[in-house]
């Protein structure tokens, strides 16, 4: 899907973000879309967890492990790292794929409206740190306009079950944290003025059973409209 600017014939890039709680099934859904959409004009961006895992202390412990063990000590550092890595990969993808549609697993707006805000509200990111974070956000994210959001809606308990089942290194997440994430996602997305497609993902199904979600997704982003 691509669009030409009528005045200057400059290709316009569309960005759609797949959102949801930790363990909601975002990564699985994005992989499924990548395998089944079959459109050369659509590019996919996974959450840069692999980049986060390269940030380690001298003992080899990752920032992700440190953050989940001690939110207050590493909240600001982790959120800055998450923001910078997400911004970097999206910027690179946009420059390399002019005029294409980008499907990203989360976006910089998620960091601001869910994770950074939640940590600030709970006192784990200090006032001065939060002001610095917002300065960074306002300065560098203005050109990363998201055109629509796909919300993978899953209850916190189901997310917790999936997190425990996948057992990623360093990912020990209390149910209370997931419940808070759920509330902040709901508050942000349900009050956003951006187009929103909500897909329920409460049940564990095989990937081939996501075909109904694929059809809803295709309709949502108008892949069949020639522009």
Regions found by a protein language model. Name each.
Residues 35-79:
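Conserved substrate/cofactor phosphate-moiety recognition/catalytic segment
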Residues 21:
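P-loop (Walker A) phosphate-binding loop of NTP-binding proteins
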Residues 29, 33:
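Hydrophobic positions on the alpha1 helix immediately C-terminal to the Walker A/P-loop
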Residues 26:
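Conserved lysine of the Walker
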Residues 3, 160-227:
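NTP-dependent small-molecule kinase module
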Residues 112-183:
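A glycine- and Lys/Arg-enriched "phosphate-lid" helix/loop adjacent to the NTP-binding pocket
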Residues 74-144:
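Glycine-rich phosphate-binding loop used to anchor ATP phosphates in small-molecule kinases
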Residues 18:
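Hydrophobic anchor at the beta1->P-loop junction of P-loop NTPases
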